[in-house]
Amino acid sequence: MRRGIRLAIIILMVLLYVTSNHGASADEWEEGFFKANQAYKVGDFQEAIEEYLRLIRSGHGGGQIYYNLGNAYFRAGQLGRAILEYERAQLLMPRDPDLNFNLSHARDQVRDAIEESRGFIEAAFFWLESFNLNELFWSFALLNLLLWAILIIRLFHKTEWLYYMLLLILSAWFVTGLSFGLKYYWISNDDRVVILQKEVNILAGPEEDDTVLFKLHEGTVVFQERSEDGWSLVRLPDKKRGWVKSRAIGLISCGSPVTSTSPHPLPTQRFPVH
């Protein structure tokens, strides 16, 4: 009996500790977000950028934060970083009309007219561009529950309509599971990078005195093949490749699946640039 009481007290204390920490974290997030928004409103875009970045580094990032950060960069005249943050936001909220408009508007400012080609798999699974990883995961989880529920019911009621329902759910379960797996793989292996500097030389090798093959400009999206000693080998969709300083590019997916939004369901304030 005493052990049970002690265990209950310990569990209660842990829950209180976690809840209080979560509340404090939420307060910090709200305060930082408010400061960033206020700075943006008065035109202090650099201060807004620093506050949004502080939120992201503390683990409070999300689609809306990346979106607002992209807008702040755009207003501050940093086109490359604006496109980088818009692309990151699009991984989390791909159907957002304001984001898609602003990203398209920012892309129109890029000097290099390079169109990204789509492979056969991307074209075949075209709908994946409209869903983020979380949406696909929870859709798959829900269909999995429905599938098991119908299988259990069919143990006792083998009716014709349940059979067709089972086939329908099974098909949707398979397609959704495959879609989630492909989306996870694509994000995990997303090697797209954005040129962050006004103009960069693409060299034949990872040395300052190597031959300049061509130039790329701020906001251009290319692919990173590998990096070594502060240099990155990048590739264009037309297969042209060369070396550039790693500090001149920004990786869109950061090499890992992006699945989360902000951990605190607070109202977000958005700042369209159009």
Regions found by a protein language model. Name each.
Residues 112, 116-154:
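Membrane-embedded alpha-helical segments of integral membrane proteins
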Residues 79, 163-197, 204-207, 211, ...:
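Boundary regions of SH3-family modules and the immediately adjacent low-complexity/disordered segments
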